[in-house]
Design a protein with these regions (language model features):
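Extended beta-strand/beta-hairpin segments
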Residues: 1-54, 61-142
Length: 142
């Protein structure tokens, strides 16, 4: 696979799930905390699954806009939203894996148009391409 890189970013984490993470440019810094469900104290802070969910949701809206801009005959509504729900748990093959639901809200679009846009975006979105074949991702138009 070949990618013509247009943008790169660098982030560093220290302390694992109970540490901190920040980007090299200083634009983003976050305190991390392990959820109770994963054996942590569930204290103040975010976890990798939350960060992944936020990133995937934002990226998927961008993918829908890119598809629409290519002349798909539809426009992504200004109030469109994507709700990404990311679960984590043990895999039957060993190790841990993710399980993802993307609920796409496209007010004002006909259901068939919305579903077609979401399906096309799923083939454009970098997160979708990174997870394809490795993670169960369910798409729903709400």
């Amino acid at each position: 696979m070949s990618v013509k890189v247009l943008y790169k970013t660098t982030a560093t984490a220290t302390g694992g799930r109970d540490g901190t993470a920040s980007t090299a440019d200083g634009a983003f810094s976050v305190k991390l905390a392990t959820p109770k469900e994963l054996g942590g104290c569930g204290g103040a802070g975010n976890n990798p699954e939350q960060l992944f969910a936020a990133g995937y949701a934002a990226c998927f809206i961008g993918a829908m806009k890119a598809v629409a801009a290519q002349g798909g005959g539809v426009k992504v509504p200004a109030d469109a939203s994507v709700t990404s729900t990311v679960g984590i748990g043990p895999r039957s093959e060993g190790g841990f894996g993710l399980d993802i639901d993307l609920a796409d809200s496209l007010p004002g679009l006909a259901r068939a148009d919305a579903e077609a846009l979401v399906e096309k975006a799923h083939h454009v979105c970098p997160y979708s391409n990174a997870t394809r074949g490795n993670v169960d991702v369910r798409l729903t138009v709400v």
